Swiss-Prot record:
Stored SUPFAM superfamilies: Glucocorticoid receptor-like (DNA-binding domain) (SSF57716), P-loop containing nucleoside triphosphate hydrolases (SSF52540)
GO BP: cell division; proteolysis involved in protein catabolic process
NCBIfam families documented for this protein: clpX, PRK05342.1
Protein name: ATP-dependent Clp protease ATP-binding subunit ClpX
UniProt-listed PANTHER family: ATP-DEPENDENT CLP PROTEASE ATP-BINDING SUBUNIT CLPX-LIKE, MITOCHONDRIAL, ATP-DEPENDENT CLP PROTEASE ATP-BINDING SUBUNIT CLPX-LIKE, MITOCHONDRIAL-RELATED
Keyword terms: ATP-binding, Chaperone, Metal-binding, Nucleotide-binding, Zinc
An example Gene Ontology CC term for this record: HslUV protease complex
Disulfide bridge partners, by residue number: none
List of residues binding ATP: 123-130
Record text on subunit structure and interactions: Component of the ClpX-ClpP complex. Forms a hexameric ring that, in the presence of ATP, binds to fourteen ClpP subunits assembled into a disk-like structure with a central cavity, resembling the structure of eukaryotic proteasomes.
Pfam family, one: AAA_2
Species classification: Bacteria, Pseudomonadati, Pseudomonadota, Gammaproteobacteria, Pseudomonadales
Organism for this UniProt entry: Marinobacter nauticus (strain ATCC 700491 / DSM 11845 / VT8)
Role of this protein: ATP-dependent specificity component of the Clp protease. It directs the protease to specific substrates. Can perform chaperone functions in the absence of ClpP.
InterPro entries listed in its UniProt record: AAA+_ATPase (IPR003593), ATP-dep_Clp_protease_ClpX (IPR050052), ATPase_AAA_core (IPR003959), Clp_ATPase_C (IPR019489), Clp_protease_ATP-bd_su_ClpX (IPR004487), ClpX_bact (IPR046425), P-loop_NTPase (IPR027417), Znf_CppX_C4 (IPR010603)
Amino acid sequence: MADERNGRGDDNGKLLYCSFCGKSQHEVRKLIAGPSVFICDECVDLCNDIIREEIQENAPEEASDRLPTPAEIRETLNEYVIGQDRAKVVLSVAVYNHYKRLRYGEGKSDVELGKSNILLIGPTGSGKTLLAETLARMLNVPFTIADATTLTEAGYVGEDVENIIQKLLQKCDYDVEKAQRGIVYIDEIDKISRKSDNPSITRDVSGEGVQQALLKLIEGTVASVPPQGGRKHPQQEFLQVDTGNILFICGGAFAGLDKVIQERSERSSIGFSATVKSQDDSKSTGDIIREVETEDLVKFGLIPEFVGRLPVVATLTELDEEALVQILTEPKNALTKQYQKLFDMEGVELDFREDALRAVARKAMERKTGARGLRSIMEATLLDTMYQIPSEHDVSKVVIDESVIKGDSEPFKIYASSDHAKAVPED
């Protein structure tokens, strides 16, 4: 039976100490006695924290035993990403097959399943990065983003491709096993395209050279990565990370790819068999991009071997006004919900009128920044109000309409007391 002692010695008046940390009974609040052993309240709390951390670490592994189906993956993507239905289907199937391959590979089989890395093609702000982030969060796997424009061949100024794996390791506290099941998103992949179709005598260290360096990493190799500290401690042994099970998702805007596809289409339909097209038959950029083929990507500047390592291609379309309005209001972490939460913390209700949301969407379309530009527009609109509200304790509601977004008027404030009441525009 455990005995609690609070500031008292034993029956003989002898001073008691915690058997774990060595503190005396006068230095702690409680000292619990067992058979010839004592533990203080601080050590009990520490033990509880250790057990709690271990339970939390093991919980994701237990929860991830069941692999979500492609339909379930798409459903989760729908909660955070608006539109891009075709890309979601392609991604859901590719990710499901990838992680099914990892589980299938754990058993013995004569059939070896190849890895299907993914290429996302779509304009800025269409949701490429968000799709990759959402997938990693849903599957509870380490995730990192790399910028292809900062990469160079080994030996040149810039980041080596191995730095990508080091970033992934940092995300999971250098747990190699976890990192080997992670997801890497390489952004701006179109910026490392070959400068020309013709071989050059000068080295292209940030273009074709990087593609060559990425080849083995994406396909699957054992990368040697310096542990924590990197070059500061060259005597440390390098960590060996097998990239064969890491899912690589590459994304880029590929500006001008539509023209490459059109040229190829026109070449294939020259002569008497060619169909005469009117101006009404002209396709949108999104429709043209959907017809992308391997030869178009090679013509654009990606080397054939690199394209071959990215067999799954998903195209994203430019977001229209309706989609941008949905992005502002519908996802779980929609921008309007975020700002409403911030105002709610001050005890103020924030109301966005429909015409205001459409004005924000139109402004983002004019800037050609897609969904990425929505936050900067909202921030600029609400900045002064967010500065004033904490000092104005009588405000109960703030209303934003189209005139506020255009900069023609200030946000409308409704005060709790009638002395400060101000007219609010009708819907």
